[in-house]
Amino acid sequence: MQDLKTYLSTAPVLAILCCSFLAGLVIEINRFFPDALTLTFPSFEFFSSP
């Protein structure tokens, strides 16, 4: 069991998990908001000028 914990805590495994999560997140955002260059919601009105 100690060997499995050591393997799962190595940098390449953690990097692959992080990249896979981010890729899945980007895919899901593009599924719900297709062709959006920026993610804009109506509640983000503090970015616009008055």
UniProtKB/Swiss-Prot annotation:
Superkingdom of origin organism: Eukaryota
Main subcellular location: plastid
Disulfide bond annotation, renumbered to this chain: none
Membrane topology: Single-pass membrane protein
Pfam families: PSI_PsaJ (PF01701)
Locations listed in the record: Plastid, Chloroplast thylakoid membrane
Cellular component, GO annotation: chloroplast thylakoid membrane; photosystem I
InterPro entries attached to this UniProt entry: PSI_PsaJ, PSI_PsaJ_sf
Spans through the membrane: 7-27
Key words, A-Z: Chloroplast, Membrane, Photosynthesis, Photosystem I, Plastid, Thylakoid, Transmembrane, Transmembrane helix
Gene Ontology biological process terms, A to Z: photosynthesis
Record flagged with keyword Mitochondrion: no
Its biological purpose: May help in the organization of the PsaE and PsaF subunits.
Similarity annotation: Belongs to the PsaJ family.
Protein name: Photosystem I reaction center subunit IX
